[in-house]
């Protein structure tokens, strides 16, 4: 939750649960092959790191140029409770036939009342470091934290077609500035609150790492049309695509910045180091 609050336009969280009512086997098994145990975190599926030190890894990855632009839209068959999610991928550089796509759904505000909904707290007592977020100073709280005190965000509900992505997504590779569209039919549980669901699209490179992702609230995805700007979002300048240059790189105490701005809108520049 803290990462989402700090980087709302760039951070896409998926919380994978294990041994509680929110467990989703496809994600739990896939995550389990990449980590040594819980709690753990992955930034773009690169390396197993403690959640308390996720931010530096995120800041190193988020500045990398993505290889494609992603657009999301969705439609809902309410009678059969099937959501069709469309992911449109437009490469900005040529990609090979080993790249894959996937879509996922996550849910915020998930709660329960039984003891199974209590949260195991690895950080209780402070011996494993300090962690604050989601309304908790985890190192100051009990283990477990009672269900009555927990509200879970970013809960991974489904990933399609699998954790590893869709085989043969680009059988002949992906050409620059060519849009590739993928449709995924997702059964929607009556236990989910669609007003709190996020629709997530992801592009995986030939090493299985996440190259780029996109996220929309479900209500926005249902109203969105690919080929047009996503509703409720702002345009972000991306270095390789829109003429933003930062030099020298790496830098010590001074940098130069040049950018090509094509309109008279107000722009905001935020500079952070790897520690945020």
Each predicted region: which residue ranges?
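Short, flexible, glycine/charge-rich loop motifs used to bind or transfer phosphoryl groups or to couple energy/partner
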Residues: 3, 30-31, 258-260
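Residue-level detector of alpha-helical hydrophobic segments embedded in or interacting with membranes
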Residues: 3, 34, 243-245
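C-terminal outer-membrane/trafficking sorting elements
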Residues: 236-276
């Amino acid at each position: 939750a803290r990462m989402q609050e700090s980087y709302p336009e760039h951070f896409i969280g998926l919380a994978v649960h294990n041994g509680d009512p929110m467990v989703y086997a496809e994600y739990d098994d896939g995550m389990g092959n990449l980590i040594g145990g819980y709690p753990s975190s992955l930034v773009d599926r690169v390396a197993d790191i403690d959640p308390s030190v996720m931010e530096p890894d995120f800041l190193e990855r988020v500045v990398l140029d993505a290889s494609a632009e992603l657009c999301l839209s969705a439609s809902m068959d309410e009678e059969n409770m099937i959501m069709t999610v469309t992911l449109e991928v437009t490469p900005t550089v040529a990609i090979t036939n080993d790249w894959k796509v996937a879509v996922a759904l996550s849910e915020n505000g998930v709660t329960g009342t039984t003891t199974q909904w209590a949260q195991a707290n690895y950080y209780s007592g402070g011996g494993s470091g300090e962690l604050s977020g989601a309304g908790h100073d985890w190192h100051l709280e009990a283990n477990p934290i009672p269900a009555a005190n927990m509200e879970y965000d970013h809960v991974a509900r489904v990933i399609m077609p699998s954790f590893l992505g869709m085989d043969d997504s680009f059988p002949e590779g992906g050409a620059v500035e060519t849009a590739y569209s993928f449709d995924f039919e997702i059964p929607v549980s009556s236990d989910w609150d669609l007003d709190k669901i996020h629709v997530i699209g992801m592009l995986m490179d030939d090493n299985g790492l996440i190259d780029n992702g996109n996220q929309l609230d479900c209500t926005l995805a249902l109203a969105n049309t690919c080929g047009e700007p996503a509703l409720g979002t702002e345009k972000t300048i991306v270095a390789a695509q829109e003429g933003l240059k930062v030099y020298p790189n790496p830098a010590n105490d001074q940098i130069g910045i040049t950018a090509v701005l094509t309109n008279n809108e107000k722009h905001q520049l935020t500079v952070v180091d790897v520690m945020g």
